[in-house]
Swiss-Prot record:
Domain observations: Domain I is involved in oligomerization and binding regulators, domain II is flexibile and of varying length in different bacteria, domain III forms the AAA+ region, while domain IV binds dsDNA.
A molecular function (GO) term: DNA replication origin binding
Keyword Calcium listed: no
Record family assignment: Belongs to the DnaA family.
Stretch list, region Domain III, AAA+ region: 112-328
Protein name: Chromosomal replication initiator protein DnaA 1
Record text on subunit structure and interactions: Oligomerizes as a right-handed, spiral filament on DNA at oriC.
Length: 448
């Protein structure tokens, strides 16, 4: 039975966590939760979808135990029920068109969403947790959370998986919204065809008026193509003005793309999220999941061995599983460390490590902290530049076998400036978990 006392306890919990998360996170994940029932043994919460349950338990389990009943195992005693779907009220500019019209009007660039790329089978870890949370926020509330959402990271880390997951979720849960998923190359080809067929106006109308969600993969292919960039930039502006959701992926952050300041500004106007290289435990989880999909059993020790030697991206791990699967099925073999060493010999070989340079460190720091290399080399003292600059100096001292005087010269600073930066970062790292993770991401990017 729901009492005012129960409601007060839940309100106190919300007030407590509100001070520990951003307003956007609170609005997306916590505000929609309703207390339905409560006893001394269990609380029933109504949630809009399974992602909210996952977010709540992943981030606030200890806090929930402090406010709500706990079960015999010390876990929060909560029963979750999914709220019945509500009818989506579409703004006037989100007019609907029939499927026959869609077929007739949709350009050839539409990418079919990969059915295997869904939130449910995306393996989450520290380096991609933020990206997944942001993507789920966008999928839950298209056009209202982060717009545009810009996801960047290296090749084969799961950017396309997340992009297609957003598309699937919106199509299944916001059925009246029209989703268009394209690669940048496909958009360019579509525009070329439209110019050739003298149907540019029709293409512009489609992209700017008849789409509610635009998912764009690999925006880096727009570099050095000024006319195409201009067209896509106008499309972004038109969609943003009418409240449509835009999600973009790239192999580098907006600040490092060779695009106009105007286009970069639009991309940086929403949320920029970095997807890093998965750490060892996540790579092992990915391996085990991919193997399970193929009916393979990989002993935990062997999975760790593979993950320790293949760490650049997820795609390489998938390739390793495919090769092992073929050998095991064709030759009727069990997976052992010896078989892995023999079968994946070329994949496990590590290229000789080049000497790490200050330039490498600066580029990696710039990518993770979303600043320009030129700013890191400059003298600006604003916090958003000064902190990453000090991180670069700290990592240079850690990773490069040079004297402080030589490192100072590389940064255009004195050796005492380098020393001060290192001491400052060492002090901050002791208490700042976010900074520790960011430094870890930079280090992994450099070492890989």
């Amino acid at each position: 039975m729901l009492t005012s006392e129960t409601q007060n306890v839940w309100t106190q919990f919300l007030q407590f966590v509100k001070t520990r998360c951003s307003p956007a996170a609170f609005g997306n994940w916590l505000a929609p939760i309703r207390v339905i029932d409560c006893s001394t043994e269990e609380v029933t919460l109504e949630i809009p979808n399974i992602f909210v349950q996952e977010y709540l338990l992943s981030n606030y389990k200890k806090d929930l135990c402090a406010f709500l009943p706990v079960d015999m195992s010390g876990e929060p005693a909560i029963r979750f029920i999914i709220a019945p779907p509500q009818k989506k009220i579409i703004p006037p500019n989100h007019f609907s068109i029939s499927s026959s019209q869609k077929e007739e009007q949709s350009p050839n660039s539409d990418v079919k969403l990969n059915n295997n790329y869904r939130f449910e089978n995306f393996i989450e870890g520290p380096t991609n947790q933020f990206v997944k949370s942001a993507a789920m926020g966008v999928a839950l509330r298209p056009g209202q959370s982060y717009n545009p959402l810009f996801i960047h990271g290296g090749v084969g880390l799961g950017k396309t998986h997340i992009l297609h997951s957003i598309g699937h979720y919106i199509k299944e849960n916001h059925k009246k919204l029209r989703v268009q998923c394209i690669t940048t190359e496909a958009f360019i080809n579509d525009l070329v065809d439209s110019l050739r067929n003298k149907s540019v106006d029709r293409m512009k109308k489609f992209y700017r008026s008849e789409i509610d969600v635009l998912l764009v993969d690999d925006i880096q292919f727009l570099q050095n193509r000024l006319n195409f960039e201009e067209e896509l930039s106008y499309t972004f502006e038109a969609l943003k003005n009418k409240g449509a959701q835009i999600v973009i992926t790239s192999d580098k952050p907006p600040s490092l793309l060779k695009l106009s300041e105007r286009t970069i500004g639009k991309m940086e106007g929403g949320l920029v999220a970095h997807m890093g290289i998965p750490e060892l435990e996540t790579r092992v989880a990915i391996l085990q999941y991919k193997a399970e999909q193929k009916g393979l059993h990989i002993p935990h020790k062997v999975a760790f061995f593979i993950a320790e030697h293949i760490h650049n991206n997820v795609r390489q791990l998938e390739g390793a599983i495919n090769r092992l699967s073929a050998h095991c099925r064709l030759l009727d073999l069990n997976i052992t460390e010896e078989l892995v060493s023999r079968t994946l010999r070329e994949m496990l070989q590590q290229a000789p490590r080049e000497k790490i340079s200050v330039e490498q460190i600066l580029k990696s720091v710039a990518a993770v902290f979303q600043v320009r290399v030129s700013d890191l080399r400059g003298s600006t003292r604003t916090k958003d530049i000064a902190l990453p600059r000090q991180v670069a100096m700290y990592l240079a001292k850690e990773m490069i076998n040079e004297s402080l005087i030589m490192l100072g010269a590389s940064f255009g600073k004195t050796h005492s400036t380098i020393l001060h930066a290192c001491k400052n970062i060492e002090k901050k790292v002791a208490s700042d978990e976010t900074l520790r993770r960011q430094i870890g991401m930079v280090r992994r990017n450099i070492e890989s």
